[in-house]
C-alpha cells in the first residue's frame, strides 16, 4: 500500500559494488522461466535460483558448456543468450541502466579486423559490462568462468582485446 504521502523509490545500482552485488540489486522474478527453459532445451530452470546473479550465472554457464553441442557460432550462441537475458530482465523495471546487444558489424578488434561476434552488454552504475559465454574460447582455459563480466580497466585488458564501437571502448576483464 502506498499512501498519497509516500514516494515509491526505484533502485539505482551503486557503483562501488561487485558485479555480483550489482546484479543482485536488480530484482527479477521467474516470469521468463518458460521462455528460458525453451531457449536452453530445458537445461536452465531459473525458478531453482533465488538471486538474480545465480539465475544469470546459470544461463551463462549453460551457454558456455552447450554451444558446441548446438553447433552455434558466436553469433548464434550470443543471440540465444541475449534472448534468455531479455526474458530474465523482462519484468525487472529496468533497474539496471540499460541493456544492449552489441552487433558484430559495429565492432572492431584493436588490429582493425571485424570479429564475427555479438554480446549482451548491461550498463551497471554507468559502466558497461559485457557478458559473453563464448569469450572463454579465446583463452587457454576453456572453463565457463574464465570470463564472466567484461569491464573497462582490467589489468589484462590491453594484453588481450580492445573492442571499439558506437558505445565506447570495451576491455575484457576477469
Predicted regions and their residues:
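Extended low-polarity, hydrophobic cluster-rich segments
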Residues: 56-64, 121-124, 151, 160-163
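Hydrophobic/aromatic-rich core segments of domains that either
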Residues: 79-155
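Intrinsic-disorder/low-complexity loop/linker signature
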Residues: 32, 42-43, 94, 112, ...
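N-terminal compositionally biased, intrinsically disordered segments and leader/signal-like regions
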Residues: 5, 12-13, 41, 140, ...
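Low-complexity, Gly/Ser/Thr/Pro-rich intrinsically disordered linker/tail segments
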Residues: 152-174
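Secondary-structure boundary elements
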Residues: 4-73, 83
